[in-house]
From Swiss-Prot:
Residues 1-21 form the signal peptide. One of its GO terms (cellular component) is extracellular region. The lineage of its organism: Eukaryota, Metazoa, Spiralia, Lophotrochozoa, Mollusca. It is found in: Secreted. The keyword Lyase does not apply. This is Contryphan-Bu.
């Protein structure tokens, strides 16, 4: 029973350090940054933007 208790304590310590370490990935500049929306028109505008950037061969679709 003593080995199981030690194993549970070690697992809890490892999990808590892993959870605390995940917050360190956030850079100060990224925290204050405004997300850039390249396609404010939604999915259809995103498709048109993709077709336009890739030199779309379908003239009616490319706008």
């Amino acid at each position: 029973m003593g080995k199981l208790t030690i194993l549970v304590l070690v697992a809890a310590v490892l999990l808590s350090t892993q959870v605390m370490g995940q917050g360190d990935r956030d850079q100060p500049a990224a925290r204050n940054a405004v997300p850039r929306d390249d396609n404010p028109g939604g999915a259809s505008a995103k498709l048109m933007n993709l077709l336009h950037r890739s030199k779309c061969p379908w003239s009616p679709w490319c706008g």
